[in-house]
């Protein structure tokens, strides 16, 4: 994920109530100059960590009490506004890259696959925009 998207995600996460961010090594460094600038400094204040590419992070998240939510364009996805998503205390929201999305293995282990309903023939948003919409709906209302 490029530095601009990483910075924008940090900014939205901080502004809209996410408590922390977990990155994979496919993500740009949030402290990279462009990321930090776009984040408006939130990359220095919002806690974050990395999952090793070889770790079973879905298992780790679930064993830590998180309900996992994968954002993906799938026919079986529930809409972001579905009340079932608000019934869980700790949510871990997983976003994929814009080019390849989320791996099938990760999707199969997720508690929920969620889609942002779209209008006017648009099927998706940029990952930074999608994260902002998602954080607003799940964490700030």
Task: Give residue ranges: language-model regions.
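Alpha-helix C-cap/termination motif
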Residues: 63-64, 86, 141
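RNA substrate-binding interface of SAM-dependent RNA methyltransferases
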Residues: 1-76
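Short, charged, surface-exposed secondary-structure boundary motifs
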Residues: 60, 79-80, 124-128
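Acidic-residue sensor for enzyme active/binding pockets
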Residues: 25, 98, 137
């Amino acid at each position: 994920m490029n530095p601009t998207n990483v910075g924008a995600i940090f900014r939205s996460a901080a502004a809209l109530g996410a408590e922390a961010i977990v990155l994979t090594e496919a993500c740009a460094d949030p402290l990279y100059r462009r990321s930090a600038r776009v984040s408006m400094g939130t990359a220095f204040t919002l806690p974050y960590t990395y999952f090793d590419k070889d770790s079973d992070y879905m298992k780790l998240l679930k064993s830590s009490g998180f309900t996992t939510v994968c954002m993906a364009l799938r026919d079986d996805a529930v809409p972001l506004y579905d009340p079932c998503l608000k019934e869980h205390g700790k949510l871990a929201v997983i976003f994929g890259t814009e080019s390849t999305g989320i791996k099938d293995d990760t999707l199969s282990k997720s508690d929920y696959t969620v889609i942002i309903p779209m209008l006017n023939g648009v099927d998706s948003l940029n990952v930074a925009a999608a994260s902002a919409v998602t954080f607003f709906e799940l964490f700030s209302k």
